[in-house]
A protein has these predicted regions:
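ATP-dependent adenylation/nucleotidyltransferase module used to activate substrates
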Residues: 4-195
Length: 195
């Protein structure tokens, strides 16, 4: 299932016939039809009992509220993008949670990105902790990681994963709510078989 036309793709590399993700994407695999796991996982959404999932979520959130007492119910990693706004809306307005918003700043925020983050905090009245590594450190890490693993923002990915967990542990916050689906992101998991 090597795509016959170039379309800006590198010849000899396998691509998903639906979304064009290359085989070089970490964790990706393809079925016999040439469709990646992430695309197959996306199909699973049509067959999920969403009412049962809602009940599971409600139980998890209620348990977190009970454990938190008067403290924060959950840690909410946010960047200020559309996903952050949606997560904050659902947690605060739909479920009535009191999240602590956290941001690992890669130190490359655009003016618009910074504004959006501040707006999200204001709209949902969120307390917020942000960690911003020194610009010199960020630049060193970017240079080293682009050479070592081909990703100049490796420190971003690591920080976005580690910082919220550190905050949840430090402040004994019982729940961490992420805003992306690993089932659709890179195919290492599915909706039926999570990581």
């Amino acid at each position: 299932f090597i795509m016959p036309q170039n379309n800006g793709q590198i010849p000899g590399i396998l691509y998903c016939i639906r979304c064009c993700v290359p085989e070089t994407q970490e964790g990706v695999s393809f079925d016999e039809m040439g469709v990646c796991t992430a695309c197959r996982s996306s199909e699973e959404k049509m067959h999920i009992n969403w009412q049962a999932r809602e009940e599971q979520l409600q139980k998890i959130l209620n348990d977190a509220k009970q454990k938190a007492g008067d403290g924060y119910d959950c840690v909410l990693p946010i960047s200020g993008g559309k996903d952050s706004f949606f997560q904050a809306h659902v947690l605060v307005k739909v479920y009535g949670l009191k999240p602590l918003a956290v941001t690992f700043s890669h130190n490359w925020f655009s003016e618009t990105g910074f504004y959006n983050l501040q707006r999200c905090l204001e709209v949902f009245n969120l307390d917020h902790i942000q960690f911003t590594p020194a610009r010199g450190t960020v630049n060193k890490l970017a240079r080293k990681s682009i050479g070592a693993i081909g990703d100049s923002c490796w420190h971003c990915h690591s920080g976005v994963g580690a910082f919220p967990l550190q905050i949840a542990t430090k402040f004994k916050i019982p729940l961490l709510v992420w805003g992306e689906s690993i089932a659709e992101n890179d195919g290492r998991a599915t909706y039926q078989c999570p990581v």
